[in-house]
Design a protein with these regions (language model features):
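Acidic/His- and Gly-rich active-site-bordering loop/insert found
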Residues: 2-97, 303
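Short, surface-exposed alpha-helical segments at coil->helix boundaries
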Residues: 30-34, 105, 251-255
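Metal-dependent amide/peptide-bond hydrolase catalytic core
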Residues: 49, 155, 162, 169-340
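Short glycine-aspartate micro-motif
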Residues: 70-72, 93, 148-152, 169-171, ...
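Short, conserved micro-motifs enriched in small and acidic residues
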Residues: 94-106, 131, 188-191, 321, ...
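Acidic/histidine-rich catalytic neighborhood of metal-dependent amide-processing enzymes
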Residues: 102, 106-169, 173, 209-210
Length: 340
């Protein structure tokens, strides 16, 4: 029997494991979306699917007679590869997505059910594609219910994020001229040009912020060349900058640094975001990006959730059971404060 063939386990640990055992690598979220839609409907929610692409659908659920909840809990259903099933020990739940972000889905559902017993209605928004391009969030942004606050879940160790760094993905392309490697003077090495361009970018002084920290650069991939005995005519690198403010100056500096060596094309930008905080709660800076910049029509954003980003996407991904339980309490506390 597949995990999606049975009903919700409303214990947060059991529900986390049940969700982890439904493989939902980005692009393959159909099964978990169908499961969440069916089970939330069974619990009495007015659940609907928002088609993002083909059979990939967001799930948005509200309580009957509460189609415009002031507070919406949200996170994503997709995970990075590879899939591995759930397991647990005395203190942790393991498995792909346990931390990022199926433990968060479980915590939000259990919190919503607890709030329901206290006559407090919140919405639930579960999205596809966050790990790839935030497609689900972009689609959802055109279908906002008019909520005032969006409590987005990502692994923050249950601390409120003061800000979330943005992202600037840049593709560098260098071109040269092929020649026999015995006669390099007859060609022009695209790889040499790319390496020089990368050296210049690495030497650039990047901005920093006293509260948020530094803008950072990761050279993620490098490829080029045809054979060891051929002067390469093309080389390419993919870079990712973590933004702490506007990208305008950085874009100009990148273009200037690589001028004459390579072209720099921006393939993705997610803006830096400052977030709403809650008095008295511990805070952190999210050095990663989230769906929040693509959900601008869903109200003032907050970012908080169980789990550590340092174990997300790893071969031993896990979430602490204690943090899952604490997250349920925390989501309830924040929602009550925002609706008081």
């Amino acid at each position: 029997m597949r995990p999606s063939d049975v009903s919700f386990h409303m214990d947060v640990v059991s529900l986390t494991r049940q969700l982890v055992d439904i493989e939902s690598i980005s692009g393959n979220e159909a099964e978990i979306g169908n499961f969440l839609h069916a089970e939330l409907s069974r619990l009495g929610y007015a659940a609907k699917k928002m088609v993002a692409e083909s059979d990939r659908c967001n799930v948005f659920a509200t309580l009957p007679n509460s189609s415009t909840p002031p507070v919406v809990f949200s996170t994503h259903m997709d995970t990075v590869p590879p899939f591995f099933a759930s397991s647990e020990d005395a203190t942790r739940v393991y498995g792909r997505g346990s931390c990022d972000a199926k433990g968060i889905i479980a915590s939000q559902i259990v919190a919503a059910e607890r709030l329901r017993t206290e006559s407090i209605a919140v919405g639930l928004l579960f999205l596809v594609g966050e790990e790839r391009d935030s497609l689900g969030a972009k689609v959802a942004n055109h279908q906002s219910p008019g909520s005032k606050f969006l409590i987005n879940g990502e692994p923050t160790e249950n601390r409120i994020a003061v800000a979330s760094k943005g992202a600037l993905r840049v593709e560098l392309t260098a071109t040269g001229r092929m020649a026999h490697s015995a006669y390099p003077e007859l060609g022009e090495s695209a790889i040499d040009k790319l390496l020089e361009a990368l050296a210049r970018l690495r030497a650039m002084k990047l901005p920093t912020d006293e509260e948020v920290g530094p803008c950072t650069l990761n050279i993620g991939t490098i490829e080029g060349g045809r054979a060891p005995n051929v002067i390469p005519d093309k080389a390419r690198a993919q870079l990712l900058y973590r933004l702490i403010g506007s990208s305008e100056n950085l874009r100009a500096e990148i273009a200037d640094a690589v001028s004459g060596l390579a072209t720099a094309d921006v393939t993705l930008e997610i803006p830096f975001t400052r977030l709403r905080t809650v008095n008295g709660m511990p805070t952190m800076i999210a050095a990663y990006t989230t769906d929040i910049p693509s959900l601008t029509n869903w109200g003032q954003p907050l970012l908080v959730g169980p789990g550590s980003i340092h174990v997300a996407h790893t071969e031993g991904e896990y979430v602490e059971k204690k943090e899952l339980s604490e997250a349920v309490d925390l989501y309830c506390e924040i929602a009550k404060g925002l609706t008081a």
